[in-house]
Amino acid sequence: MHTTALVLFSGGQDSTTCLALALSKYQRVETIAFDYRQRHLVELDARLIVLNEIRARFPQWASKLGEDHLLDLAVLGEVSDTSLTRDTAFKMEQSGLPNTFVPGRNLLFLTLAAAVAYRRDLQVMVTGVCETDFSGYPDCRDDTIKAMQLALSLGMDKRFLIETPLMWIDKAATWALAYELGEKSGTPGGGQALVDLIIEHTHTCYLGDRQHRHAWGYGCGSCPACELRARGYERYCAARTAG
């Protein structure tokens, strides 16, 4: 039976929902993030705020929340010519992929996370990648994650489990999952409390915009990440209203 987990935690909506899920399942949960000189570097500030808010608002989870790890991955920014690591406009490439795709990003993240998990004796890695609302990123595919799980388990001679709780659900369902997890957290009114925390403190916008406040949170409102988050929130609210 697995009792420990390492969550790849960027400070965004998806990884915060994954963190809540891990805290609801496991006895000890640690977090990891990567500074690869991303344009939306504000997410690294957001994640610390989110961690503090979880500790303050959800005491039963706080007792399980362990060490946070931040790794410097500047080399990824140096070898990547994308709109997430360069000041360039968002567009679709001839390959059919958006220029927000950072080649090898999730592969490196998982490899380094596995090395930390190995050292910290953490049995499960949890990541928020998904195929449903994704932008065509090949390193978010279920097949990719399963291949990485096998390669890392063989290469480190340790059986790793990579959980992807959002793999087959869309953004509306991700909002709903956050509400459900909050309701089961032991905190009175925890469902809305977790949704409000995600709205107010998590960061998704590729441009790093924390000036413009929307019903679903902060962001420019026009980048692909903001559009996905906004549409998901609208559908979530509509479903809640419909009952």
UniProtKB/Swiss-Prot annotation:
GO terms for biological process: queuosine biosynthetic process. It comes from the Bacteria. Catalyzes the ATP-dependent conversion of 7-carboxy-7-deazaguanine (CDG) to 7-cyano-7-deazaguanine (preQ(0)). Its cofactor is Zn(2+). Keywords: ATP-binding, Ligase, Metal-binding, Nucleotide-binding, Queuosine biosynthesis, Zinc. The gene is queC. Binds 1 zinc ion per subunit. It is an enzyme of class 6 (ligase). HAMAP family: QueC. ATP binds at F9, S10, G11, G12, Q13, D14, S15, T16, T17, C18, L19. It catalyses: 7-carboxy-7-deazaguanine + NH4(+) + ATP = 7-cyano-7-deazaguanine + ADP + phosphate + H2O + H(+). This is 7-cyano-7-deazaguanine synthase. Belongs to the QueC family.
